[in-house]
Structure formats: structure tokens, C-alpha cells
Amino acid sequence: MLYILIIILLIGLDQLSKIWVLNNLVDVSTIPIINNVFHLTYVENRGAAFGLLQNNQWIFIIVALLATVFGLYYLNTRKVHIFGRLGIILIISGALGNLIDRVRLGFVVDYFDFRIIWEYVFNIADVFVVVGTVFLCIYVLFFESKSR
């Protein structure tokens, strides 16, 4: 059950970063960390990645809840290699972090703005989901059949 504590800590990190953004970036919009390369930029994201499915909050809420339930079920009923376990933990943490925003605020708070390579702004929860997906793919491709 250590994974529950890790999920709670990761969600806490995500929410603390978003509270900081809401308290410090709303009025200034953006703070250049490395000018024209990396900024902290306040964005209210009402859709998914790349601006898809704007204003369809219920879809994201249902998907986040299903991912969480399935992930927790899988962790509790299967022997899972560390890559799979970390992947599931990160995906659940990211999904719930953004879910909290959607329910509490009606949008997701995004703030990482790597202007030099990417036009989209994202947050720590998004990083959790992407890295978790990579770990889950590694698990499925290389370890899943061995852990059965």
C-alpha cells in the first residue's frame, strides 16, 4: 500500500505547484525563466492536450475516474514489475491532479511553457501522465508476459 502514499504525495506536489501559480501568475500572466526559451505562463486549460475537446469536462472526469479505478484494481490484483507499477502510479497521480482542478476550478491550471520547442503549456500532472505512459509501455513491451 506504499503506492497510495506515493500517489498522495505526487498529487500534493501537483496541487501545491498550481496553488503557487494561482497566487503568483494570474495577474502577471508569464514570468520568463530563460527569455524566449522557458517561461512560467498561466493558462486555464478547459480541454485536453493540444487544446482538444474544449469545454467537455465530463469526458475528462469520467476518464480520470476510470483510469484511477482500473489502475488501483490492477495494482491490487496483479504482480506488476516496477516499470508497470511506477507507470500506473504516475498516471493515477496525474489524472487525479488534473481531475481536482476540473472539479474545483472548472479548468486545469497549466504553466510550463517551453517556447523554443513547444507551443503548448502544460503542468506537473501532465508530466506524470506522459512519463507514466512511457513506463507502462516499457512494462507491457518487455516485462508484462514475464510477470504472469
Curated annotation (Swiss-Prot):
Cell membrane is among the record's keywords: yes
BP term (GO), one: proteolysis
Pathway assignment: Protein modification; lipoprotein biosynthesis (signal peptide cleavage)
EC number, UniProt record: 3.4.23.36
Transmembrane regions: 57-77, 80-100, 124-144
EC class of the enzyme, as a word: hydrolase
Record localization: Cell membrane
GO cellular component, one term: plasma membrane
Keyword Protease among UniProt keywords: yes
Chief subcellular location: membrane
Membrane topology classification: Multi-pass membrane protein
Active site: 110, 126
Superkingdom in the source lineage: Bacteria
This protein's UniProt keywords: Aspartyl protease, Cell membrane, Hydrolase, Membrane, Protease, Transmembrane, Transmembrane helix
Molecular function via GO: aspartic-type endopeptidase activity
Catalytic activity, as annotated: Release of signal peptides from bacterial membrane prolipoproteins. Hydrolyzes -Xaa-Yaa-Zaa-|-(S,diacylglyceryl)Cys-, in which Xaa is hydrophobic (preferably Leu), and Yaa (Ala or Ser) and Zaa (Gly or Ala) have small, neutral side chains
UniProt xrefs under Pfam families: Peptidase_A8
Disulphide linkage map: none
Xref: HAMAP family: LspA
Family membership noted in the UniProt record: Belongs to the peptidase A8 family.
Function: This protein specifically catalyzes the removal of signal peptides from prolipoproteins.
Name recorded for this polypeptide: Lipoprotein signal peptidase
